[in-house]
């Protein structure tokens, strides 16, 4: 995203050699537009019908509010082909197993269960209060949600102003058990519920394992949009039960209650909107990299998935360390 607001690009190529590339293209400024507007400008109406499925139903918001730069960062050529071709991979033991295995190989393993309550940056050092004890470091890389960073760190006015521009998606999940003989045999997109007017209803349900009739079915719901009121969480949970019934997959009941075996509401896909994207939000944050012994990474600096987040972290380390 860095430089896009000014029609400039500068970084490492997505090749094995990762050679440095830079240049100018005024058309890059269009990436700050909401994706709906970008498609209209380029006369690409059919793209929305294909891309709304892996974007909006996966919790990344509506095309009339999310800047194009985020959409194209996520749905690059390879990723789009994999979705269209049904080549979607999952990990047998879940994605957390990747990081557990990685952590086991690190010379300095991650310290878990760390409750950070205070960060003070002074005298070219970083003082962090973690689990009630103060520790001192040379540099700080923040990957936690930046909009909450001022709640425990000695943020400057510039940091507070920029981070206050961040919003996020309220993306909810419910794992439910379906009535016997009513189980779906595959996952399913509910296209009409990917439109803003149907906010708070099931956009997709996920059927993970083949030929396991009693597996939990996972429902996914968005509960907020730009400029709108945040919907009530419990009401959206009730909506999903009605939706599954209407889709022919009624939730099984036990002792008169629906069998919802797990549910959650998540801080998901932090982002800025088009007006701040176009005003150079990313360039302003980039200009702060290294100041006060602090660097900024995490989802907001790239995109809300593992691939892009890791890519930015790699790029940050190459540039500054």
Q: Whereabouts are the PLM-identified features?
A:
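Mobile amphipathic helical/loop "lid" adjacent to a hydrophobic cofactor/ligand pocket
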Residues: 1-66
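C-terminal segments that line or cap access tunnels to active or ligand-binding sites in enzymes
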Residues: 137-139, 147-295, 302-307, 311
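Soluble non-cytosolic domains of exported or imported proteins
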Residues: 29-30, 93, 231-234
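Internal hydrophobic alpha-helix adjacent to the cofactor/substrate pocket in enzyme cavities
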Residues: 309-321
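Non-transmembrane alpha-helical segments in soluble domains
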Residues: 36, 40, 99, 103, ...
